[in-house]
Regions:
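N-terminal glycine-rich phosphate/pyrophosphate-binding loop and immediately adjacent elements
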Residues: 2-132, 137, 142, 146, ...
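A glycine-rich dinucleotide-binding beta-alpha-beta segment and adjacent secondary-structure elements
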Residues: 204-211, 220-227, 262-265, 411-422, ...
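FAD cofactor-binding and catalytic pocket of flavoenzymes
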Residues: 85-106, 110-113, 117-118, 123, ...
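Glycine-rich loop(s) and the adjacent beta-strand/alpha-helix scaffold that form part
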Residues: 28, 32, 37-57, 250, ...
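Aromatic-residue-lined binding/catalytic grooves and analogous aromatic/hydrophobic interfacial grooves
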Residues: 20, 234, 239, 355, ...
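A conserved FAD-binding loop/helix module that cradles the flavin
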Residues: 530-548
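Short, glycine/acidic-rich hinge or "gate" loops at secondary-structure transitions
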Residues: 44-47, 162-174, 476-485, 557-560
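Conserved redox-cofactor binding core of oxidoreductases
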Residues: 59-66, 70-103, 108-109, 118-123, ...
Length: 560
């Protein structure tokens, strides 16, 4: 084991959305920061090796193979294909245990999942931050929308969020770039939807981290809809396109990939962290790094893993475990349920371009006097389009008629899937599995999570409501679906180290400090006290920027 002689002002663990923001904010405020990433380096532009490839340029035309399915037993459940396989974790090196099925899609590299995320970016409202207190569920959030609003402003301006201003109380407007346009099928549904349901159900363009105007070092989105390959234009927000260049520009950032942080070092006399211990993923050498503050941004489950691994005789269950809530209250957004139908009257219309964005129907259930048999609610994401030539292949036709059928655009269809809020539940938890180790001899995580009765009741409305809306809008051949969903599949894992007002019932305080060690901050999905139904990444960004501002101020005051 070796010890690095440098004492940094801050160490940031993880380089995804939250870690990138922590590095940017801390360095720009004058701190010398060490950014540790357990996976490989991915250089912006240079390493997006498939960004301009067509399907014909892949050995398997971009599709999955039997050998891929054998190697990627988790990824095969949904996301497996040839085009961006390099961005996903090696499952043999980094396994996990499922007491109950949990679909954990991980991306261990500089940038993390910011390279492959869906980019939908929505603010939460006070309906969300007051929900637990209002419903008597779990614990109250220690912050409110008013406290986070200026930080939403801050991160939206830098990230480049495009969207429309709608004046909706449940979905606050932000500092938007010009919105992308709805297509004619979506406009038809949006206009007809306004005239029904008391005006409470709205269809808007998605709010997405695809820039519609150029930003520093970034070109506006080119409408290629190939974001998951990495964008050589910097058209969407990622660590590589946005926060990492800003942090590097300060000259105060040190980036170390291939650095697996195995524990936070705790000074019992000072009652705070002194640094972290790292295994070099390539050489397997152990190195200790020192810092005045530590930001844990390794993603919700891995951040909890790190806190659990940081056990001492003071905290035998891990740093932050004094409340008994560390590793508990795992949440995700349940989805794969909705409806679709055929639009008539637009046969002379077509779509131009490949807009990398869909529509959004904001939450309306259990709001504005509505009361259901379940708590909370859901929003819809989807879109309208025309089927293409591939629909004709199944007919196996021949001759002129078959050619004409393949050359003619198909019917217009509209479909949407709902994303529903999951309630925090102490029984949904993760733990260290000391009987199973990864490639580096470290214990893996054991998952024990399931949907509850509230989510099951909600899913009925998630399917039927969209069918009802499409019928109101005049669509035909409407069908609903409720496909099998397992926790984790939404890739919005949250909880495990929740914020709260009381150290007896939460892991973090209102500023994301671990109650048990005030110079350790957790600002990724682990900190979330409830899950809302909106995509959470924008809220991670705002929470991280707010916590970094507080941490620097406290450090300067000598309080850390």
């Amino acid at each position: 084991m070796t010890t690095d002689s440098t004492t940094y002002d801050a160490i940031v663990v993880g380089s995804g959305i939250s870690g990138g923001w922590a590095a940017k904010e801390l360095t720009e405020k004058g701190l010398r920061v060490l950014l540790l990433e357990r996976g490989r380096n991915v250089e912006h532009i240079k390493d997006y090796v498939n960004a301009t490839k067509g399907p014909w340029e892949y050995l398997h035309r971009g599709r999955r193979t039997v050998s891929m399915e054998e190697k990627y037993q988790v990824l095969r459940r949904d996301l497996l294909n040839e085009t961006n396989l390099a961005y996903w974790v090696n499952e043999q090196d980094s396994p996990y245990t499922e007491t109950k099925r949990y679909d954990w899609f991980r991306a261990y590299q500089v940038g993390g999942r910011s390279l492959v995320w869906g980019r939908q970016s929505y603010r939460w409202s006070d309906f969300d931050f007051t929900a637990n207190a209002r419903d008597g569920i779990a614990v109250d959030w220690p912050i409110r929308y008013e406290e986070l609003a200026p930080w939403y402003d801050h991160v939206e301006r830098h990230a480049g969020i495009s969207g429309s201003r709608e004046g909706l109380a449940q979905l606050p407007d932000g500092q938007f770039q010009p919105p992308m346009a709805l297509n004619c099928g979506e406009e038809l549904v949006a206009e007809r939807l306004k005239k029904g349901f008391g005006g409470n159900r709205r269809l808007i363009i998605g709010r997405t981290a695809n820039a519609t105007r150029a930003l520093e070092g970034r070109t506006a989105c080119q409408y290629r809809d190939a974001c998951w390959l990495g964008c050589i234009f910097g058209g969407y927000f990622s660590t590589q396109s946005s926060t990492l260049p800003a942090a590097m520009k300060t000259g105060r950032l040190t980036l170390k990939p291939w650095s697996i942080v195995t524990e936070i070092l705790y000074d019992k006399e000072q009652r705070k962290a002194s640094g972290v211990r790292v295994i070099d993923a390539v050489t397997e050498q152990t190195i200790d790094y020192s810092a005045k503050i530590v930001f844990v941004c390794a993603s919700a489950l891995n951040s909890a893993w790190l806190l659990m691994r940081s056990a001492t005789d003071v905290w035998p269950e891990g740093l932050g475990s004094s409340s008994g809530e560390l590793g508990h209250n795992v949440m995700d957004h349940h989805f794969r349920v909705g409806a679709a139908g055929r639009i008539e009257g637009l046969e002379d219309k077509a779509i131009e371009g490949r807009r990398p964005n869909g529509i959004y129907v904001p939450r309306y259930r259990n709001l504005f006097g509505d009361k259901r048999s379940y708590l909370r609610g859901f929003g819809y994401q989807g879109g309208a389009g025309r089927s293409d030539w591939s629909r004709a292949v199944a007919e196996l036709g021949i001759g002129a008629a078959a050619k004409e059928e393949a050359a003619t655009p198909g019917a217009w269809r509209f479909g949407a899937t709902a994303f529903g809020e999951t309630l925090p539940n102490h029984a949904n938890h993760i733990a260290l599995d000391h009987t199973r180790k990864d490639k580096w001899g470290l214990p893996v995580l054991k998952m024990d999570c399931a949907l509850g009765e509230n989510e099951r009741l909600m899913r009925k409305d998630m399917a039927n409501d969209m069918a009802e809306m499409l019928e109101h809008c005049g669509l035909k051949d409407i069908s609903t679906y409720d496909a099998e969903y397992f926790p984790g599949a939404g890739i919005h894992e949250m909880g495990t180290a929740r914020m709260g007002r009381d150290p007896k019932t939460s892991v973090l305080n209102a500023h994301n400090q671990v109650w048990d060690a005030k110079n350790v901050f957790v600002t990724d999905g682990a900190c979330m006290t409830s899950s809302a139904c909106q995509n959470p990444s924008l809220t991670y960004m705002a929470i991280t920027a707010r916590a970094a501002d507080f941490a620097v101020a406290e450090l300067k005051r000598g309080n850390l």
